[in-house]
């Protein structure tokens, strides 16, 4: 059995009870933290919390050489952990299908993820989100500034009145950076303000799931100059606003009246 | 006032009169006597003593040049000569004749308007003669001919007037055949063949310092009969006084070579692709000393006191100290610290050097041989590509770890001075690679590092540079990214020989206007549609984008090219460069989000797919080969041809020429390492030979695996090939 367990948004307490039980029952516990990580904890604290040993896999160890995970799942109970939910944004559906190919049973235990927090914290309704996109570091993609596909996505959503959830790039163990790099919401707002539209409204969500989670709405140009503290951040570019959404952004996200 | 100073002042006066300037190069096969001739000209102009000319070899200033008795670097010199009552300023470049140093010849030709081709009367036109004439004509440089060592025909071979005439006419005929072949298709060149009647051919002996030409005979009244008499009776001194070589040759230079005003309007369109209607084009055509400054750097040298010196041709404007100039291909400006002209091996600083001259400049720290230097940003000159490419590599290490930084700096400097040298720095292992034109080329360069820089080095055995090439067309191959969300569908086809040749010669590149590129490719036989879809030219391979309207592909294309470049630099057989592949992208499936189709996904997907397609296209190892010509007495002919055949070589022709037999053939460069000593012992030192790099050839199938494993082992790669390789 291979069980995909989402660890939730912030620290070792963000996992669901069902997830905790699955980890406790597993023979082997694997995890990947190259797509995202729990900012409020580390692997050692997680191991202590769950009283288990976590085998951390890098990108190649998941995408190119998943055999050890699959072998463990074929022989016994294995769990595979990621931050957030295992099947949203970073989709590990490929790993699940490879397991199915080998006749291994699989199940998914969900957890809160950035997409649900974005709606949950900003008051923007999840019915009114369009396609999501990721803003990469300028050096990490094949074009200059902001990739056309990012602004195309935002604009296509806005034409239909829809909000865009913009994930911000994370580089873990990347040869180009020392340590880990997390794009901040102000860097993202600056990139979009410079390459797209400085007057457009943006909503920053910082440290979703943490006790000090922060939400701020303002023009992108103004968000570019603000500091939202430690990671992880994400950014929402709203489309048209329902009146309740407008009120929420003003009340809960401090949006200045002239920006709405 | 010293004599030298006087000449410098005379030169400075003449520099402002382009009509009076001749920029020339002396070029020839090795040992045909260029440098001795140059000494004669210098002595004639009063630059060195008459007595030592011929032995002094004033131009061979490097210690190793004097030791080896050959010219290695192209050297510059200026002199004055009076012809028909007018003083002329002659800027002269002596070039190396040995084939390994051909890059210097090519670069020198860019700076000059006339090439004095020197041919040995006894040996006749040789392979290197053909190469230098070709190099000159390609650059739009006008040739004249000096047939040297005529004294040997008279004294050694005891030839009579008729035999001599026949021999000289055949040399002229050979050279003219070359000239006709190269200029037939050029409409901007009238008849450039040389002839005795026109005065574009001179004869003589650089060693004994006499010379004749049709005009000189008319002037002095000395005909061939008189010359034979004097030479036979050993009255060479008299011969020299009556008809001195320097006057005969320098008169020919002044009369028959174009001055910059005549030459530049014709040469600029050949060597510069910028806007012909621009002000700068006009100023270059007119050799306008008041126009914008344009200098084409053809040589970088190092002076122990002044540091790096850039030498080159001033095509427009006037170079002065303190100017801030752009250097093509680099950002920012360099400040000119001094300007000068050359006298022998020495540089004389002057206040300014106007258009039409060859200048020596310090302070251009970013310039390399081939840079365009100007006071406003401009289209650079056509790159001076020397057509032969590195075929031999040696590893080079500093003996003392402390010398490591200095060695790296020196290696970089060497490749800056000689673009036919290529350097691969490996800071991790400290074992660097230096690649060049041949064994001698590398030996000279490494000795110079030891001697001039005082860095003791250890060098490895010379290694041949291999390549990999597809020998058939592949089926469609699917490349999948590690996350399996992105797929690329590609094929590999063989590039036609004609297209490959155009890339090799630099006639087609991504730097040229698209329309022009299409035309060249179509003329070389590429179909129209393919030529319109060229996405990139990667090394000597072409990448075609056959896809239509795939969303997000445009922002992924750079990564696709990165993946292709990786796979083509390190081929699947032995990580040697791939050439001659036409890679076609037929279709692609991409993830919606940029982060899931980033470098970590796209590069491995395309790199793998290209390697698999290359294997499917029966990729094979290519090795460099050389044309070999051996001149040998008939009793040693068997031994000589055996030396070629024993080296996996092929003898194509054997024929008699004079009292010698000539053996012609080809052999792999790898097997030719160590040829010099073997042929010497096989023929008791009686053979003279010449080799010339002749491109790459597919290696025989029964050797493929063995050589590939040798290379893989040397590179520390796995010594097994992918199982899918079954075609040899």
From Swiss-Prot, chain A:
Domain of life: Archaea
Pfam families assigned to the protein according to its UniProt record, in alphabetical order: TP_methylase (PF00590)
Assembly and interaction partners: Homodimer.
Family: Belongs to the diphthine synthase family.
Designated name of the protein: Diphthine synthase
Reaction it catalyzes: 2-[(3S)-amino-3-carboxypropyl]-L-histidyl-[translation elongation factor 2] + 3 S-adenosyl-L-methionine = diphthine-[translation elongation factor 2] + 3 S-adenosyl-L-homocysteine + 3 H(+)
Record has Hydrolase as a keyword: no
Assigned keywords, A-Z: Methyltransferase, S-adenosyl-L-methionine, Transferase
E.C. number(s) listed in UniProt: 2.1.1.98
Described function: S-adenosyl-L-methionine-dependent methyltransferase that catalyzes the trimethylation of the amino group of the modified target histidine residue in translation elongation factor 2 (EF-2), to form an intermediate called diphthine. The three successive methylation reactions represent the second step of diphthamide biosynthesis.
Broadest EC class assigned to this enzyme: transferase
Signal peptide start and end residues: none
GO-annotated molecular function: diphthine synthase activity
Record HAMAP family: Diphthine_synth
Organism: Halobacterium salinarum (strain ATCC 700922 / JCM 11081 / NRC-1) (Halobacterium halobium)
Pathway the protein contributes to: Protein modification; peptidyl-diphthamide biosynthesis
Curated annotation (Swiss-Prot), chain B:
Positions carrying Diphthamide: 596
UniProt subcellular location: Cytoplasm
Residue ranges annotated for the tr-type G domain, each copy included: 19-261
GO cellular component, one term: cytosol
GO molecular function: GTP binding; GTPase activity; translation elongation factor activity
One GO BP: translational elongation
Domain of life: Archaea
Family annotation (SMART domains): EFG_C (SM00838), EFG_IV (SM00889)
Positions annotated to bind GTP: 28-35, 94-98, 148-151
Keywords: Cytoplasm, Elongation factor, GTP-binding, Nucleotide-binding, Protein biosynthesis
Functional note: Catalyzes the GTP-dependent ribosomal translocation step during translation elongation. During this step, the ribosome changes from the pre-translocational (PRE) to the post-translocational (POST) state as the newly formed A-site-bound peptidyl-tRNA and P-site-bound deacylated tRNA move to the P and E sites, respectively. Catalyzes the coordinated movement of the two tRNA molecules, the mRNA and conformational changes in the ribosome.
Family, as annotated: Belongs to the TRAFAC class translation factor GTPase superfamily. Classic translation factor GTPase family. EF-G/EF-2 subfamily.
NCBIfam families (alphabetical): aEF-2, small_GTP
Record-given protein name: Elongation factor 2
Gene: fusA
């Amino acid at each position: 059995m291979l069980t995909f367990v989402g660890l939730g948004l912030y620290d070792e307490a963000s996992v669901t009870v069902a997830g905790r039980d699955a980890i406790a029952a597993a023979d082997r516990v694997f995890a990947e933290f190259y797509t995202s990580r729990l900012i409020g904890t580390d692997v050692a604290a997680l191991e202590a919390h769950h009283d288990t040993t976590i085998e951390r896999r890098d990108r190649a160890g998941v995408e190119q050489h998943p055999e050890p995970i699959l072998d463990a799942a074929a022989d016994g109970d294995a769990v595979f952990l990621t931050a957030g939910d295992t099947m949203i944004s970073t989709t590990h559906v490929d790993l699940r299908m490879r397991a199915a190919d080998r006749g291994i049973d699989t199940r998914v235990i969900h957890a809160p993820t950035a997409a649900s927090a974005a709606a949950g914290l900003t008051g923007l309704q999840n019915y009114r989100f369009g396609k999501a996109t990721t803003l990469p570091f300028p050096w990490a993609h094949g074009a200059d500034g902001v990739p056309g596909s990012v602004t195309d996505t935002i604009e296509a959503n806005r034409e239909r009145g829809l909000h865009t959830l913009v994930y911000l790039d994370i580089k873990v163990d990347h040869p180009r950076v020392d340590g880990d790099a997390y794009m901040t919401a102000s860097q993202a707002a600056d990139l979009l303000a410079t390459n797209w539209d400085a007057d457009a409204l943006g909503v920053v969500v910082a440290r979703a799931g943490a006790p000090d989670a922060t939400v701020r709405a303002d023009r992108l140009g103004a968000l570019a100059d603000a500091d939202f503290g430690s990671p992880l951040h994400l950014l929402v570019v709203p489309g048209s606003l329902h009146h309740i959404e407008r009120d929420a952004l003003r009340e809960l996200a401090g949006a200045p009246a002239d920006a709405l | 006032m010293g004599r030298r100073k006087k000449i410098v002042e005379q030169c400075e006066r003449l520099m402002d009169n382009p009509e009076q300037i001749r920029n020339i190069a002396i070029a020839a096969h090795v040992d045909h006597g260029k440098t001795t001739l140059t000494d004669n000209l210098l002595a004639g102009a009063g630059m060195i003593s008459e007595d030592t000319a011929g032995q002094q070899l004033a131009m061979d200033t490097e210690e190793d040049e004097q030791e080896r008795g050959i010219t290695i670097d192209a050297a510059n010199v200026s002199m004055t000569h009076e012809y028909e009552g007018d003083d002329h300023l002659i800027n002269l470049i002596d070039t190396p004749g040995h084939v390994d140093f051909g890059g210097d010849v090519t670069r020198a030709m860019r700076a000059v308007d006339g090439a004095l081709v020197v041919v040995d009367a006894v040996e006749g036109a040789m392979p290197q003669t053909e190469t230098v004439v070709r190099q000159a004509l390609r650059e739009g440089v006008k040739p004249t001919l000096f047939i040297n060592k005529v004294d040997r025909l008279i004294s050694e071979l005891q030839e009579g007037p008729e035999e001599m005439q026949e021999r000289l006419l055949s040399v002229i005929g050979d050279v003219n055949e070359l000239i006709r072949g190269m200029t037939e298709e050029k409409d901007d060149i009238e008849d450039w063949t040389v002839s005795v009647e026109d005065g574009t051919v001179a004869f003589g002996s650089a060693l004994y310092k006499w010379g004749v030409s049709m005009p000189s005979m008319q002037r002095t009244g000395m005909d061939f009969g008189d010359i034979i008499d004097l030479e036979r009776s050993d009255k060479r001194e008299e011969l020299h006084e009556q008809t001195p070589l320097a006057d005969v040759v320098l008169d020919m230079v002044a009369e028959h070579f174009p001055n910059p005003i005549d030459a530049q309007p014709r040469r600029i369109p050949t060597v510069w692709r910028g806007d012909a209607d621009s002000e700068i084009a006009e100023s270059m055509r007119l050799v306008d000393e008041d126009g914008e400054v344009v200098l084409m750097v053809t040589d970088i040298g190092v002076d122990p006191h002044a540091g790096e010196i850039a030498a080159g041709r001033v095509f427009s404007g006037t170079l002065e100290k303190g100017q801030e100039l752009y250097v093509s291909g680099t950002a920012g400006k360099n400040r000119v610290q001094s300007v000068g002209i050359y006298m022998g091996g020495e540089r004389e600083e002057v206040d300014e050097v106007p258009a039409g001259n060859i200048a020596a400049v310090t302070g251009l720290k970013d310039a390399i041989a081939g840079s365009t230097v100007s006071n406003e940003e401009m289209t650079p000159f056509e790159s001076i590509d020397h057509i032969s490419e590195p075929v031999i590599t040696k590893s080079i290490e500093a003996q003392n770890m402390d010398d490591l930084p200095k060695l790296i700096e020196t290696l970089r400097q060497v490749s800056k001075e000689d673009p036919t040298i290529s350097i691969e720095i490996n800071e991790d292992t400290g074992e660097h690679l230096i690649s060049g034109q041949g064994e001698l080329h590398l030996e000279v360069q490494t000795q110079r590092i030891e001697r001039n820089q005082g860095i003791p080095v250890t060098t490895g055995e010379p290694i041949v540079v291999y390549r990999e090439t597809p020998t058939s067309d592949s089926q469609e191959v699917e490349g999948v990214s590690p996350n399996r969300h992105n797929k690329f569908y590609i094929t590999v086809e063989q590039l036609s020989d004609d297209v490959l040749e155009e890339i090799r010669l630099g006639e087609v590149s991504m730097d040229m206007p698209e329309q022009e590129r299409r035309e060249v490719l179509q003329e070389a036989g590429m179909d129209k549609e393919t030529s319109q879809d060229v996405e990139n030219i990667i090394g000597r391979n072409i990448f075609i984008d056959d896809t239509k309207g795939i969303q997000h592909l445009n922002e992924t294309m750079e990564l696709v090219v990165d993946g292709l470049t990786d796979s083509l630099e390190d081929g699947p057989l032995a990580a040697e460069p791939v050439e001659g592949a036409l890679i076609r992208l037929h279709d692609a499936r991409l993830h919606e989000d940029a982060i899931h189709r980033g470098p970590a996904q796209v590069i491995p997907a395309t790199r793998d797919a290209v390697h698999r397609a290359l294997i499917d296209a029966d990729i094979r190892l290519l090795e460099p080969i050389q044309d070999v010509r051996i001149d040998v007495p008939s009793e040693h002919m068997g031994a000589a041809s055996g030396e070629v055949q024993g080296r996996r070589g092929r003898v194509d022709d054997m024929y008699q020429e004079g009292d010698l037999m000539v053996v012609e053939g080809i052999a792999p460069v790898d097997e030719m390492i160590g040829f010099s000593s073997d042929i010497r012992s096989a023929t008791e030192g009686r053979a003279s030979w010449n080799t010339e790099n002749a491109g790459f050839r597919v290696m025989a199938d029964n050797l493929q695996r063995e050589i590939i494993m040798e290379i893989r082992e040397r590179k520390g790669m796995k010594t097994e090939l992918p199982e899918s390789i079954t075609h040899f």
